[in-house]
Design a protein with these regions (language model features):
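Short loop/turn elements at secondary-structure junctions
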Residues: 71-143
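Conserved short "hinge" loops at termini or chain/domain junctions
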Residues: 1-61, 118-143
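Elongated alpha-helical scaffolds
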Residues: 59, 63-72
Length: 143
């Protein structure tokens, strides 16, 4: 399930309408949306059932998806920008970094998708697995 639509991405590019004649076609934008929706699922699937369906969570993930697609399109458009290429690529990479930071914080549990369905912790015959990191201290009895 895609987290964004062509119209959502189009709203970010006021001076460009995606068609079959533009440097980035509408079909390519839809492919980018599908690809980045799968990337998002990969990042959040360790904590939440995917695809995420909660309304508030969908709104957040839509913004992340749009940002990732926007970054990809800006990098493609920057190739033909001449002198402005470096600054446009820098902006595109900053947009991508912000979106990826959100996904990392969701994966680590620092950012919560309040209305998304949480995955149950995995149990095995050897023990209980959760997202907590083990802490081992030097020169201290821990058992």
């Amino acid at each position: 399930m895609p987290y964004a639509a062509l119209e959502d991405v189009q709203a970010e590019f006021l001076n460009l309408t995606f068609t079959n004649a533009t440097p980035v076609t509408d079909t390519e934008v839809e492919d980018f949306i599908d690809t980045y929706s799968m990337v998002i699922d990969g990042w959040v699937s360790n904590r939440y059932a995917v695809p995420v369906t909660g309304a508030a969570s969908l709104a957040m993930l839509k913004e992340v998806c749009v940002a990732l697609v926007k970054s990809k399109i800006k990098r493609i458009l920057a190739r033909g920008a001449g002198a402005k290429q470096e600054s446009q690529e820098k902006v595109a990479l900053e947009i991508r970094k912000e979106a990826m930071d959100i996904l990392r914080s969701i994966k680590k549990g620092e950012q919560d998708l309040h209305d998304a369905t949480r995955k149950a912790p995995v149990t095995t015959s050897y023990g209980y697995i959760n997202e907590q990191q083990a802490v081992f201290k030097k020169d201290e009895d821990q058992w």
